[in-house]
């Protein structure tokens, strides 16, 4: 590829990435929690950025609860153990509830919904739902990693003395295992973030700790949404 073609391809990936509403939301999330880390809960510019970005992000999530509602009623892959099915459906139900209630919180903060006290209560309930969905996600990922580990070990025995890294199926399973490990780390971080937003342990999970974990999990989300890099042509 020429330099111009390479640059055009790279910019094309950026355009594809930024065209995703989810990607823009996660970039804003990184800004939000980065500002929370800098402010440490103290009044000032950083705290204003945190609050304003948090409100702006809610617009990205309007009607997003439908996605998890659809996943809730969709069939699961055959062979999935019942405990993982139940945990997965619980995650969908809790996340859908969080996103639905979050819309009422947005209406309250914009002044459309007048009962501010009820909006605040619903806001706390929504955060508990999000924390619950993150816990369910963590447990699902642990279970799926266990299944993948057993599958990889079985495949290693079948491959025998051959170079396992040359086996396409083996590489795919290892890549999937890495993806699930990253998802597990992110879900664990999100539990801490929810804990901090709910102020369940304000002395330990301070706004700065919440901001640090939220910023890190946002970067992971941004990475997970990256489009696949086009393979360069061999001459």
UniProtKB/Swiss-Prot annotation:
Tissue: Expressed in roots and developing siliques.
Transmembrane parts of this sequence: 92-108, 207-226
Cellular component terms per the entry's GO annotation: extracellular region; peroxisomal membrane; peroxisome; plasmodesma
Subcellular location: Peroxisome membrane
Major location category of this protein: membrane
Note: Can complement the yeast pex11 null mutant.
Induction: Up-regulated during senescence.
Positions in the Lumenal compartment: 109-206
Gene: PEX11C
InterPro entries referenced in this protein's UniProt entry, alphabetically: PEX11 (IPR008733)
Pfam families per the UniProt record, alphabetical: PEX11 (PF05648)
Membrane topology (UniProt): Multi-pass membrane protein
Keywords per UniProt: Membrane, Peroxisome, Peroxisome biogenesis, Transmembrane, Transmembrane helix
Subunit note: Homooligomer. Interacts with ARC5 and FIS1B on peroxisomes.
One GO BP annotation of this record: peroxisome fission
Organism ancestry: Eukaryota, Viridiplantae, Streptophyta, Embryophyta, Tracheophyta
Protein task: Involved in peroxisomal proliferation. Promotes peroxisomal duplication, aggregation or elongation without fission.
Molecular function, one GO term: identical protein binding
Topological region Cytoplasmic: 1-91, 227-235
Record-given protein name: Peroxisomal membrane protein 11C
